C-alpha cells in the first residue's frame, strides 16, 4: 500500500518516511514476532538486534544537532512521520527514536545543562552506535501522580539524593524503566529535599551505567510492547558527582519540564497510528482473500462496514496528530492550543485499541493464533494504554487545561 503523504510534506520528509518504512519492512517485521514470543522477556529487546542498523541509516541520531554530529532534524512533524512507520513495524522499537529526542531535549535545554555537558554526552551518543538513554521516574509508590504533578510531601519520588561534598549519595528504586541495563546514560529524578513536594524538593541527575552502587533488578514480563525492555533500577549508596546534576538543586519537576521542548507524546501517538494501520492492513488483506458463504469476507456488509470504520479511524487519528505536530513546529506563527497534544495522543491510543480489536474480530479464530501478528497488535495497543502515566491521567491533564480555560482549577480527590 502507498504511504500516507500530504501536499505540505517536503521532498526530504517523503524520503525519510520511505527510509523508515523500508527499515520497518525489511529489518523490524521479519524478527518482531520471534522477539515478542521469546520466553525470557530480556531476550525480546530490540536494540541488540537492530541498534546498529538504525545507526547506519541515521535514524538513531536524527534528532541530535548537526554541530554534535547528528542529523539536525528538530521539527516534530518529521519525527511523527518516522514514528508512524516504525510503529507500523513494531510498537516497541519506537523507543529508539525517543532515546534520540530525549537526550536532545535534556542536553539542549540551556537552563539545565552546561556547554561541557552537551559536548560530552551528545558527542558520546553519536559516536557509539549502541548508545541509548533512559529516563527513570516511576517508582513502586510514585507513578501517575508525577504527571499532574501531586506536590504533597507524602507522595512523589522517594528515591533520595543526599549531598555530601561534591557528590550525591543516591538511594532508592525505580521500576518500569525502558532500556534499563542496556542504556548507557540515565536521567534520574530524585528527592533532594524530603520536607518539600516534588515541585520544590526534586532534582534531576545524570547517572552513567557502571556507576558504583547502581544495579538492575528484574526485567518486567509484559503483556505487550515486549520489544521494548522494561526493568528495575536499584540505587544503594550510589555516588554521583554534583556536576552530573541538570539545573539547580531542588529545581522541581514542573520547572524542569518547563525547559524541555515537548513532543514525545505525539511521537508515541504517531506510533499508535502506525500500529493501528498495520492491523487494518492485515485485516483488509485477510478479508479480500477469505471466503464464507460463497463470497469474500469484505463483501459481507458486517465486515465491510467494520473496515470502513477502521480506515476512517486510522486516517482521522493521523490527521489529528499531524495537525498537533505542525502547530508545535509553527508555534511562533500560530496560536498554540495547549490541549491539542494531549487530546491527539488520547485519541490515537484509544483508536488503536478499537482498530486492533476489530482486526481480531475480522480474523475470527485465526486472530488469536500466535502464528499471526494480529494478537500481538492487540496486546501492544492495550499495553500502551498503561504507559507514560496511563490513559486516565492523560485525560485528567487535558481536563485540567479545560478547567484552567474556564477559570477553574482541577482538584485532586
Report the location of each language-model feature:
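Glycine-rich phosphate/cofactor-binding loops in nucleotide/flavin-utilizing enzymes
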Residues: 82, 363-413
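Glycine-rich beta->alpha junctions and the first turn(s) of the following alpha-helix
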Residues: 5-16, 215-315, 384, 406, ...
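Amphipathic, small/basic residue-rich leader segments at the start of a protein or domain
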Residues: 1-97, 120, 401-413
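A short, Trp-centered hydrophobic/proline-enriched beta-strand micro-motif
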Residues: 129-144
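C-terminal helix-coil-helix/basic helical segment that borders enzyme active sites and/or dimer interfaces
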Residues: 29-41, 284, 288-295, 311-347, ...
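Internal helix-loop-helix
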Residues: 55-132, 179-185, 328, 332, ...
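A structural signal for short hydrophobic beta-strand segments in well-ordered beta-sheet cores
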Residues: 161-162
Amino acid at each position: 500500500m502507498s504511504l500516507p503523504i500530504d501536499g505540505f510534506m517536503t521532498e526530504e520528509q517523503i524520503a525519510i518516511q520511505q527510509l523508515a518504512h523500508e527499515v520497518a519492512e525489511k529489518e523490524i517485521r521479519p524478527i518482531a514476532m520471534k522477539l515478542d514470543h521469546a520466553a525470557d522477556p530480556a531476550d525480546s529487546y530490540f536494540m541488540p538486534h537492530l541498534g546498529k542498523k538504525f545507526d547506519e541509516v541515521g535514524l538513531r541520531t536524527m534528532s541530535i544537532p548537526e554541530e554534535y554530529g547528528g542529523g539536525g532534524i528538530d521539527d516534530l512533524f518529521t519525527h511523527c512521520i518516522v514514528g508512524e512507520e516504525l510503529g507500523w513495524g513494531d510498537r516497541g522499537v519506537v523507543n529508539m527514536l525517543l532515546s534520540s529526542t530525549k537526550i536532545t531535549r535534556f542536553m539542549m535545554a540551556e537552563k539545565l545543562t552546561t556547554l561541557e555537558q552537551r559536548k560530552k554526552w551528545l558527542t558520546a551518543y553519536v559516536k557509539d552506535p549502541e548508545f541509548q538513554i533512559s529516563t527513570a521516574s516511576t517508582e513502586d509508590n510514585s507513578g501517575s501522580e508525577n504527571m499532574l504533578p501531586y506536590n504533597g510531601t507524602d507522595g512523589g519520588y522517594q528515591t533520595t539524593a543526599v549531598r555530601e561534598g561534591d557528590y550525591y549519595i543516591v538511594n532508592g528504586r525505580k521500576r518500569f524503566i525502558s532500556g534499563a541495563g542496556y542504556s548507557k546514560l540515565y536521567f534520574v529524578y530524585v528527592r533532594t529535599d524530603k520536607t518539600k513536594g516534588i515541585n520544590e524538593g526534586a532534582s534531576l541527575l545524570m547517572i552513567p551505567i557502571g556507576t558504583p552502587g547502581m544495579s538492575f533488578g528484574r526485567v518486567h514480563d509484559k503483556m505487550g510492547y515486549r520489544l521494548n525492555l522494561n526493568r528495575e533500577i536499584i540505587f544503594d549508596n550510589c555516588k554521583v558527582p554534583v556536576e552530573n546534576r541538570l539545573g539547580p538543586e531542588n529545581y522541581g519537576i514542573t520547572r524542569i519540564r518547563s525547559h524541555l521542548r515537548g513532543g514525545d507524546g505525539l511521537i508515541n501517538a504517531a506510533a499508535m497510528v502506525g500500529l493501528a494501520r498495520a492491523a487494518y492492513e492485515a485485516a483488509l488483506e485477510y478479508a479480500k482473500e477469505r471466503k464464507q458463504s460463497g463470497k469474500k469476507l469484505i463483501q459481507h456488509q458486517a465486515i465491510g462496514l467494520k473496515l470502513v470504520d477502521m480506515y476512517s479511524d486510522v486516517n482521522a487519528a493521523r490527521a489529528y496528530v499531524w495537525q498537533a505536530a505542525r502547530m508545535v513546529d509553527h508555534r511562533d506563527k500560530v496560536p498554540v492550543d495547549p490541549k491539542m497534544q494531549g487530546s491527539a495522543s488520547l485519541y490515537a491510543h484509544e483508536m488503536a485499541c478499537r482498530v486492533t480489536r476489530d482486526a481480531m474480530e475480522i480474523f475470527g479464530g485465526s486472530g488469536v493464533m500466535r502464528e499471526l501478528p494480529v494478537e500481538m497488535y492487540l496486546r501492544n495497543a492495550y499495553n500502551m494504554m498503561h504507559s507514560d502515566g496511563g490513559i486516565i491521567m492523560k485525560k485528567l491533564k487535558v481536563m485540567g487545561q479545560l478547567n484552567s480555560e474556564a477559570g477553574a482549577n482541577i482538584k485532586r480527590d
